[in-house]
From Swiss-Prot:
PANTHER family: URACIL-DNA GLYCOSYLASE. Its EC number is 3.2.2.27. The keyword Cytoplasm applies. This is Uracil-DNA glycosylase. It is an enzyme of class 3 (hydrolase). It comes from Buchnera aphidicola subsp. Cinara cedri (strain Cc). HAMAP family: UDG (MF_00148).
């Protein structure tokens, strides 16, 4: 078995940066930025990897592509910086979270950095987007990259809880070794689908049960979320 403490994201990037698709992807995004506003900012694109070291991953929450309005995307799926208005999907995530733990408090902000620092890897399937155009960077190569990320986590880590919300995320299940990890699925927290399975899925509570059963420290989902 591989020693997770001797393997890091650096090892992963050293592998991927040699691949033709990745070189093409980075060059393509660079060219798009010359004529178009792209989110998140260049220095935030890989924030998920900076906030959550490979060896600390307990949970993976897989999103789709970044928010496409100004000031929202900052490299963590579903998250927005402090002070930014909560997008609808994030509002619904917090509704479900509060219902999981019968907890309520006003003035909650949308920055999920505290989750990331506790081992919740907040990954989008596509890591960039052009301003105002959702899914505009689909099929540029990000899907190949993030599929490799998921495979790498599945191979190197053990006992990770994968939260797959929505059809796009659920299609990634085949990348995960279900014999050594846990997969929880539901509809997307978007207003279009939240009542079709996301509300009431109890994923936050179930995740902590699965972590505790492995003698891992549960996630404090409310840590540093209040303004």
């Amino acid at each position: 078995m591989k020693n997770i403490y001797k393997i890091s994201w650096l090892d992963f990037f050293l592998i991927e940066k040699k691949k033709e698709y990745f070189l093409y992807l980075l060059n393509k995004i660079k060219n798009i930025r010359r004529n178009t506003i792209v989110y998140p900012k260049k220095n935030m694109v890989f924030n998920a990897f900076l906030f959550t070291p490979l060896s600390s991953i307990k949970v993976v929450i897989l999103g789709q592509d970044p928010y496409h309005s100004a000031g929202q995307a900052h490299g963590l799926s579903f998250s927005v910086p402090k002070g930014v208005f909560l997008p609808p999907s994030l509002k619904n995530i917090f509704i479900e979270l509060k219902n999981n733990f019968s907890f309520y408090k006003k003035n909650i902000h949308g920055c999920l950095e505290s989750w990331a620092k506790q081992g919740v890897f907040l990954l989008n399937s596509i890591l960039t987007v052009s301003k105002g155009i959702p899914n505009s960077h689909k099929n540029l190569g990000w899907e190949i990259f993030t599929d490799q990320v998921i495979k790498f986590i599945s191979d190197i880590c053990k006992g990770v809880v994968f939260l797959l919300w929505g059809n796009i995320s659920q299609k990634k299940y085949y990348l995960i070794d279900s014999k050594k990890h846990f997969i929880l699925r539901s509809t997307h927290p978007s207003p279009l689908s939240c009542y079709k399975g996301f509300f009431g899925c109890n994923h936050f509570f179930k995740t902590n049960v699965l972590l505790q059963n492995q003698k891992k420290k549960p996630i404090n989902w409310f840590l540093d979320l209040f303004e």
